[in-house]
């Protein structure tokens, strides 16, 4: 068993009965997809995510919901710590959001269903041309009002509350859509499914003030990536300092 996978393995075992319900409901909701609107499909995705949260003995505290922009599309950009990250955000974000995920990871059980239910996108890391096409599509969708969840780090390596390198290319969507970027800070999210402890845990989600287009329009993708990372790093350090970490 991989390092830090014991907790996740127990969640998988406990989730097996619910998985049968999930598969049946997802198939019903997606065939044909137009039978169920975006909101109904998103509520099912939230149910799936919330079921996993309960089985992982996780409580998530959410801060800054008032910072989410109104009447416009936007892109959520969180740090990445583990398997629970997207689940926690979907649970806490009342309006439907779509998710961008690496293609191979997106084909796994639960991820596959959540991506379908949220009208998300699958990004092939080995096909640069397809990547550009998908990012353009996301930019157009966000311009038309859709909300997207994108992890600039692209993955996680048991980094816990430490940031990794941000991939500047994903910020193409923001320049194309000219919409706000909402930096999101995840604290202790790794504890939910990427640890060996079976004790209840508490994670935090902090939605920071959005970075408006006027603030980043004169930057290039690398500078914008640095700006978003800096906002997340500052808040993360503040939170860790508050608890004496």
What are these regions (language model features)?
Residues 1-74:
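Membrane-anchoring hydrophobic helices of lipid-metabolizing enzymes
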Residues 22, 26-29, 37-41, 55, ...:
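Catalytic core of membrane glycerolipid acyltransferases/transacylases, capturing the structured
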Residues 55-63, 130-132, 187-189:
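Short gly/ser/thr-rich secondary-structure transition/capping motifs
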Residues 2-5, 132-245:
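Non-catalytic C-terminal accessory region of glycerolipid acyltransferases
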Residues 61, 82, 107, 131-135, ...:
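Amphipathic coiled-coil/heptad-repeat helices and related helical stalk/stem segments
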Residues 7-18, 104-107, 111-116, 183:
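The first long alpha-helix at the start of the GST-like C-terminal all-alpha domain
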């Amino acid at each position: 068993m991989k390092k830090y996978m014991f907790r996740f393995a127990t969640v998988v075992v406990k989730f097996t009965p619910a998985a049968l319900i999930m598969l049946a409901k997802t198939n019903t909701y997606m065939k044909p997809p137009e039978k169920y609107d975006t909101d109904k499909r998103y509520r099912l995705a939230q149910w799936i995510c919330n079921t996993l949260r309960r089985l992982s003995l996780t409580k998530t505290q959410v801060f800054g919901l008032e910072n989410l922009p109104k009447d416009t599309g936007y892109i959520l950009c969180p740090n990445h710590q583990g398997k629970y990250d997207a689940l926690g955000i979907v649970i806490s974000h009342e309006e439907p959001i779509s998710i961008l995920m690496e293609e191979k990871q997106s084909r796994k059980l639960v991820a596959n269903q959540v991506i379908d239910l949220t009208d998300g996108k699958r990004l092939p890391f080995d096909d640069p041309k397809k990547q550009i096409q998908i990012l353009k599509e996301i930019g157009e969708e966000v311009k038309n009002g859709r909300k997207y969840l994108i992890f600039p780090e692209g993955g996680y390596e048991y980094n816990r509350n430490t940031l990794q390198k941000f991939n500047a290319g994903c910020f193409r969507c923001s320049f194309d859509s000219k919409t706000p970027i909402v930096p999101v800070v995840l604290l202790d999210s790794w504890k939910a499914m990427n640890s060996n402890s079976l004790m209840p845990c508490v994670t935090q989600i902090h939605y920071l003030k959005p970075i408006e287009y006027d603030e980043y329009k004169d930057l290039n993708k690398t500078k914008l990536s640095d700006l978003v990372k800096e906002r997340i790093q500052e808040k993360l350090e503040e939170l860790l300092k508050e608890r004496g970490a």
